């Protein structure tokens, strides 16, 4: 298993500095990770640092609450792509979902997909806030709206990825849509368990320690 190609090497802390972003990109190049995942402000620098490599530049949209408007999420997506983003992870409108406003949830995702075009779109469900039924509904709406991936968590709420949620999401979306585990994946054992449950991507700040087998001090995003 080439674990490095499962990893979105992630740094989304609000106090991330330029030095920390530079180190993230250097590590991603060194270990040939699938992507770096950074806040929109750092997309342009990350794209410049990773130019000529295979490492993709992923950013987050409507992050971390998902409660911004459809229009603002679409605009944020266009801006991120203009700055060099090659993947986007948007946060689902959790409040709309829990209110039963499924039309808004779907329109929200579809608007970001339209803005993203051919850019890979992952939809963050924030599974720790959802019932089992809501997780299934969220997966189905994401697929219907054109998402390429569904993703467990922002890493900023009450919980992260679980093997059970990954298995449920994989079962719901089928074999042709990606599933990303994020939040609390801090070691190789956990990463392998997520992959065996159906994850096709791992979002973590502990990517280096996962691929090298070292003990981690990462946040486990």
UniProtKB/Swiss-Prot annotation:
The protein's location, in the record's own words, is: Cytoplasm
**CDD domains, alphabetized:** DeoC
Tell me, what is an example of a GO biological process annotation in this record? carbohydrate catabolic process
* Species assigned in the record: Brevibacillus brevis (strain 47 / JCM 6285 / NBRC 100599)
- Recorded metabolic or biological pathway in which this protein acts: Carbohydrate degradation; 2-deoxy-D-ribose 1-phosphate degradation; D-glyceraldehyde 3-phosphate and acetaldehyde from 2-deoxy-alpha-D-ribose 1-phosphate: step 2/2
The protein depicted here goes by the name Deoxyribose-phosphate aldolase
> What family is this protein classified in?
Belongs to the DeoC/FbaB aldolase family. DeoC type 1 subfamily.
Q: Which PANTHER family match?
A: DEOXYRIBOSE-PHOSPHATE ALDOLASE
Catalyzed reactions per annotation:
2-deoxy-D-ribose 5-phosphate = D-glyceraldehyde 3-phosphate + acetaldehyde
Q: Name one Pfam family in it.
A: DeoC
**Principal EC category:** lyase
Q: Does the keyword Nuclease apply?
A: no
Q: What is its EC number?
A: 4.1.2.4
